[in-house]
């Protein structure tokens, strides 16, 4: 479905274009952006649309939203979107099946992907993790939540075969746990906070607790990136500026997050919204280039994260052979931003 911020972006673009000549209006180039609603890493898309930053770089965004990463990446086959954000697990799957590129990192969501237990069972599982053996865990397959859960199981000396895994969407997991039909669930924020606040569930292990790096990915269709590299660079510059602004104006950022989450059907406390900021590091332009740097032909930090994710997916039977990180992760477009004085200055603005 079309994202709720599409109308905002269109309206802002119209106003900005309308202030100049008709020729200026014609210079706005459509770019199709995909994301998942009411998620921390998607907030910059909303903020940038509200602030009119896409139009400042000559872009007119058209947004589409998806409930999870797998249907999102599948939609790329029909070219329904050009660029976007998603989890690192679907980004890797998208590289194999749909020739998608990972062009940057949205955030470190290692803490935000976790295994939760219902209020009545959590303490028992925490005291004796081995008791999870034989239990049923509901989670969204081929997701960052799935990766975090299996990393937690490994931390406790358990394997996927030691539990029964049932795959379902995040809304279904919340419903199942809230109604007492499931005791253990793999969720990602802000759904984790919804379960804690509305149903008294407890987070018993996160990807971070298990030592698993769980990044979010900025992605692009390879064919689009080849045809429109400058638009991809502009997309990145807008996204990076939005994070700069969000981190520098947290009170206003929290207010905008509240509205954005509510549009996606999520209502959480201000304390939980603040926790999103404190537990999920983001990267500015310099930070992105640092973690994606392949100095002397070696692997980057991001390569290492995705190599482990690929191994997890291969072990799951998602594909027979994991893709080499260097084949689908590229800093080419971030370097374009860095090399362009205008884009670099834009990306680094916090106002």
Cite the ranges covered by each PLM segment:
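C-terminal segment of classical bacterial N-terminal signal peptides
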Residues: 8, 13-23
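Short, glycine-/small- and polar/acidic-enriched structural segments
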Residues: 26-169, 176, 183-189, 204-205, ...
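Short linear loop/turn motifs
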Residues: 62, 271-283, 324-338
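Soluble non-cytosolic domains of exported or imported proteins
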Residues: 66-70, 85, 139, 143-144, ...
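Pocket-lining segment of extracytoplasmic ligand-binding domains
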Residues: 121, 172-270
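Secondary-structure end/capping motifs
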Residues: 227-320
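Conserved C-terminal helix/tail region of periplasmic/extracytoplasmic solute-binding proteins
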Residues: 303-351
